Design a protein with these regions (language model features):
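Alpha-helical cap/lid subdomain in secreted, periplasmic
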Residues: 2, 77-233
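Short, glycine/acidic-rich beta->alpha junctions
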Residues: 44, 73, 138
Length: 233
């Protein structure tokens, strides 16, 4: 994990900024670099990245955004590099979402479509699944190499859905993955595939959406802290 003297950056989607936990009371302060009207009803100070970095006494910044895609995280990284100098020993954590449901493509009419349309033919959906893997791998390669080129140590994990990479073009090193692509943080926190069961839903999820409640965020943080301690990253 990032040293106390270095800076830790957290990139991610709504899970990383405490979506559904109520409007921020300002406790995140200048640490939350992506605070805007789109991120209403979010309490990043109660989300797992803040809990982890606060527990480890780290200097950190939050760059999460609701609905963020892997590709948008790359754009967010580029924005950060354009706007801020890179401090020594900076570590960047990229908390990846579901790469299939967060996939944009242009259809034959020139319209931008997000995700797989439910009424598409089977062969189209199968092709899009393959395209998602390629696009995600290319985007992660870019994030990885851009971090290294700018003196940033990249760290990757999947928050709530495992991902598949195209291994023939994957350029990332094994040590950059805090959690392997075949696993995800929610499985470590709640049990494999258990975030959707009734008990977990009632205890650890917001009643109105699929986001973790405050206790659920605490479990995510504990699972990640344990993983960090075991892997010494």
């Amino acid at each position: 994990m990032g040293s106390q003297d270095g800076l830790v950056l957290w990139f991610g989607d709504s899970w990383t900024i405490g979506d559904g936990l109520g409007k921020s009371n300002g406790d995140a302060g200048t640490k939350w670099l992506t605070n805007c009207h789109w991120n209403r009803n979010c309490r990043p100070e109660l989300a797992f990245p803040s809990i982890v970095s606060s527990t480890l006494s780290e200097n950190y910044r939050l760059l999460g955004n609701r609905g963020e895609t892997i590709q948008q995280m790359g754009c967010r990284l580029k924005w950060y590099l354009d706007e801020f100098p890179v401090e020594e020993e900076t570590v960047a954590y990229f908390c990846f979402p579901n790469y299939k449901g967060r996939y944009y493509y242009i259809d034959n009419r020139g319209n931008e479509v997000r995700g797989n349309p439910g009424n598409a033919p089977k062969h189209v959906i199968e092709w899009q699944d393959v395209a998602c893997k390629w696009d995600a791998t290319i985007a992660i390669n870019w994030i990885y190499n851009t971090c290294l080129a700018n003196g940033i140590t990249p760290r990757f994990l999947q928050t709530w859905r495992k991902i598949e990479l195209v291994e023939s073009i994957n350029q990332t090193s094994g040590e950059s993955w805090v959690i392997p692509p075949s696993e995800c943080l929610s499985d470590l926190a709640f049990g494999k595939g258990e975030f959707g069961n009734q008990y977990v839903r009632c205890r650890y999820r917001n009643t109105h959406d699929n986001h973790p409640n405050q206790e659920g965020q605490r479990r995510l943080a504990d699972a990640l802290l344990e993983t960090i301690a075991i892997n010494n990253v």
